[in-house]
């Protein structure tokens, strides 16, 4: 089954109910939300989510397991200085996600900034273990990154090493097509790309895909998303990811730019699903 959707706005007054309504208007059957502003840890109480309205009207069309939650960008579980704050926040975030019944929490692995990469890697593994020990149900997904600055997890071997070191069925990977392209993985050589996923074992942990085109050439380490078919990856390659059996039942989530201050996810989803 093809599961496809986009990032949708989780905001007052309708929160979850409004977000899933927007997804359905885009002809999607999956969705991704932030539980608050992406650059902030501010959160409203779960009783404001309008979960009962969602449950009554939209539960069957987009069930909770196909609602992906993204952690805010400002946390850094790989930093020995910021880890405690990040970990405490993520434990509370998972409690809110369990209220919804969503299955996956995507998070950026963090930066090693003023620390060595090895120190940051050990801290990240420790953080993930601690968060999982204090929570239940939700699966943490480390997102593949572009390699910009001191970002962690810009190559498949590193992200798999971290996932396997955590030793939990509640840890996995979210692959971002723009990020891996910018990190130097040539998706346009599709057979070789799929071979690399198998070789590094990343495919064993892949739970969600962020489906984005890239404004930048291969290996640029820029992380600038483009609309579907308007970047260097191209529609043909992104459509292969939608339809290839290797990625069956994995939710594909668009995070592409707005056009004239409006999302065009409905058009992009239709474009991707169009068989040629």
From Swiss-Prot:
Zn(2+) 1 binds at residues 70, 108, 143. CDD domains: AP2Ec. GO terms for molecular function: deoxyribonuclease IV (phage-T4-induced) activity; DNA binding; DNA-(apurinic or apyrimidinic site) endonuclease activity; phosphoric diester hydrolase activity; zinc ion binding. Binds 3 Zn(2+) ions. This is Probable endonuclease 4. It comes from Mesomycoplasma hyopneumoniae (strain 7448) (Mycoplasma hyopneumoniae). Zn(2+) 3 binds at residues 179, 223, 225. HAMAP family: Nfo. Endonuclease IV plays a role in DNA repair. It cleaves phosphodiester bonds at apurinic or apyrimidinic (AP) sites, generating a 3'-hydroxyl group and a 5'-terminal sugar phosphate. Belongs to the AP endonuclease 2 family. Its cofactor is Zn(2+).
């Amino acid at each position: 089954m093809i599961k496809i959707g986009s990032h949708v706005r989780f905001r007052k007054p309708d929160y979850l109910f409004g977000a899933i309504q927007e997804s359905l208007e885009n002809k999607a059957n999956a969705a991704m939300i932030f539980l608050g502003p992406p650059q902030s840890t501010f959160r409203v109480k779960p009783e404001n989510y309008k979960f009962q309205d969602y449950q009554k009207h939209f539960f069957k069309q987009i069930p909770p397991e196909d609602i992906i939650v993204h952690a805010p960008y400002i946390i850094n579980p790989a930093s020995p200085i910021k880890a405690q704050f990040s970990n405490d926040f993520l434990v509370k975030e998972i409690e809110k996600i369990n209220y919804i019944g969503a299955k996956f929490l995507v998070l950026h692995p963090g930066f090693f900034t003023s620390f060595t990469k090895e120190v940051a890697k050990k801290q990240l593994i420790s953080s993930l273990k601690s968060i999982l020990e204090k929570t239940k149900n939700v699966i943490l997904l480390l997102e593949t990154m572009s390699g910009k600055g001191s970002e962690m997890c810009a190559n498949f071997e590193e992200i798999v090493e971290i996932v396997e070191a955590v030793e939990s069925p509640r840890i996995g990977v979210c692959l971002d097509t723009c990020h891996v392209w910018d990190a130097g993985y040539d998706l346009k050589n599709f057979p070789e790309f799929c071979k690399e996923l198998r070789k590094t074992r990343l495919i064993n942990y892949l739970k969600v895909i962020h489906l984005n085109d890239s404004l930048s050439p291969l290996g640029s380490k820029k992380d600038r998303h483009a609309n579907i078919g308007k970047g260097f990856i191209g529609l043909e390659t992104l459509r292969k990811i939608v339809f290839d059996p290797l990625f069956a039942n994995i939710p594909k989530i668009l995070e592409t730019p707005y056009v004239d201050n409006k999302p065009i996810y409905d058009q992009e989803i239709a474009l991707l699903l169009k068989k040629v």
